[in-house]
Amino acid sequence: ALWKSLLKGAGQLVGGVVQHFMGSQGQPES
């Protein structure tokens, strides 16, 4: 179904954002 594809894409996007924030917190650039 189309909604399943959209949900999967949204899940991957959220996962990437979470990993990005976790990495940023681990190594602050400022």
Curated annotation (Swiss-Prot):
Record's protein name: Dermaseptin-J10
Tissue: Expressed by the skin glands.
Subcellular location: Secreted
Function: Has antimicrobial activity.
Annotated GO CC locations: extracellular region
Family: Belongs to the frog skin active peptide (FSAP) family. Dermaseptin subfamily.
Keyword line: Amphibian defense peptide, Antibiotic, Antimicrobial, Secreted
Single GO biological process annotation from the record: defense response to bacterium
Organism listed in the record: Phasmahyla jandaia (Jandaia leaf frog)
